[in-house]
Amino acid sequence: MPQPMKLDPLSNTFKHALAGGRPQIGLWLGLADPYCAEICAGAGFDWLLIDGEHAPNDVRSTLAQLQALAAYPVAPVVRPPVGDTHLIKQYLDLGVQTLLVPMVDTPEQARQLVQATRYPPQGIRGVGSALARASRWNAVPDYLTRANDEICLLVQVESRLGLENLDEIAAVEGVDGVFIGPADLSASLGHLGHPGHPDVAQAIEDALRRIVGAGKAAGILSADERLARHYLALGATFVAVGVDTTLLARAARTLAASFKDKSREEAEPEPQGGSVY
């Protein structure tokens, strides 16, 4: 059920939960629709990822989903298509406090992202709070002085180069957590479409341990319940355990198959695939 707006609109409860080591269970949103987002908001997840990298989301569709989630006790996380300074500025002005930025391969990239998410003098974020939903259009009097501290920056490491630089990336001040992307990582390691390959699995486990050892929050997406629980046991603190598109597709196929004859069902088996997506 919808909840009253939190007393402190600037407090990033998701960031504070990660800092406290409290596991946060999430769901990926790829349907790019506020109605679906609101359904998922009431399901009981700690966070929902609005995906702008692989789903057909833009700034306006992201805004609509943020508005749909606002009345619920769930933390929105937004993944932009790329770590572009200008796009990040727009998302932050919409009220996004937690960003998951894909394809971060070097500590230099990570430092640039920290700069993009902070107001001067700590960063280079442009100031336009009178136009920003984030400040409630200047109705939050201390927004400009507190905004930097409440931003949660999560960077996504998903390549061989990223793994090589993982320790340096995790050490960047202002990076709150590092997310391992199994699908792209498997491709980079030479196992396209096979994130469960032993080489990939070993690389993921090693990466999660290194992130935790660096004192940063470790995250991952796995629709395999056994694997998701395994990653939590390894110390991952923000774990997405499903994708809305997959949930809908599987439920629709299962329902249709239950009314079809056996030969049709055998001729059209449930797609398995190797990707967590």
UniProtKB/Swiss-Prot annotation:
The record marks 93 as: Increases basicity of active site His. A divalent metal cation binds at residues 158, 184. One of its GO terms (cellular component) is cytoplasm. Gene3D superfamilies: Phosphoenolpyruvate-binding domains (3.20.20.60). Its cofactor is a divalent metal cation. Keywords: Lyase, Metal-binding, Pyruvate. Aldolase which can catalyze in vitro the aldolisation reaction between hydroxypyruvate (HPA) or pyruvate (PA) and D-glyceraldehyde (D-GA). The condensation of hydroxypyruvate and D-glyceraldehyde produces (3R,4S,5R)-3,4,5,6-tetrahydroxy-2-oxohexanoate as the major product, 2-dehydro-D-gluconate and 2-dehydro-D-galactonate. The condensation of pyruvate and D-glyceraldehyde produces 2-dehydro-3-deoxy-L-galactonate as the major product. PANTHER family: 2-KETO-3-DEOXY-L-RHAMNONATE ALDOLASE, PHOSPHOENOLPYRUVATE CARBOXYLASE FAMILY PROTEIN. This is Hydroxypyruvate/pyruvate aldolase. It comes from Deinococcus radiodurans (strain ATCC 13939 / DSM 20539 / JCM 16871 / CCUG 27074 / LMG 4051 / NBRC 15346 / NCIMB 9279 / VKM B-1422 / R1).
